[in-house]
């Protein structure tokens, strides 16, 4: 099986400005991109951040999380793999967990 590396994580947040201040001010991430994107929930603000110029984004903040809707704030956890065969090998191992 080939190498698997972390790619990025996305959070659906209520207050995107506050979360941007947290990730940039406290954790030292840099905003690499921003803007509204069309989603199944409508057009939402996004902020892409990274700790390294080699990565467009490592932490993605998606605004528009409703206060009254209880759901998981982690939208995705993404990894990179060397090839599709690595993904298939990982898929075969899932029942072990």
Language-model features and meaning:
Residues 1:
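A short, basic/flexible loop-to-alpha-helix module at the beginning of a structural domain
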Residues 4, 14-17, 77-97:
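Vicinal oxygen chelate
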Residues 6, 59, 71-74:
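Short, structured motif recognition centered on aromatic/hydrophobic residues
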Residues 8-10, 48, 76-78:
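Short aromatic/hydrophobic contact patches that present stacked aromatics
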Residues 11-56:
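Core segments of cupin and vicinal oxygen chelate
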Residues 37, 75-76:
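Short helix/strand-bridging catalytic loops that position acidic/His residues to coordinate divalent metals
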Residues 54-56, 68, 84-87:
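Short, charged/polar surface micro-motifs in flexible loops or helix N-caps
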Residues 62-67:
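Short beta-strand/turn micro-motifs at beta-sheet edges
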């Amino acid at each position: 099986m080939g190498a698997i590396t972390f790619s990025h994580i996305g959070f659906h947040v209520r207050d995107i400005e506050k979360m941007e201040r947290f990730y940039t001010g406290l954790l030292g991430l840099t905003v690499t991109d921003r803007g509204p994107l069309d989603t199944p929930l409508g057009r939402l603000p996004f902020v892409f951040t990274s700790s390294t110029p080699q990565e467009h984004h490592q932490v993605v903040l998606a605004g528009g999380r409703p206060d009254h809707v209880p759901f998981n704030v982690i939208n995705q956890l993404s990894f990179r793999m060397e090839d599709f065969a690595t993904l298939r090998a990982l898929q075969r191992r899932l029942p072990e967990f």
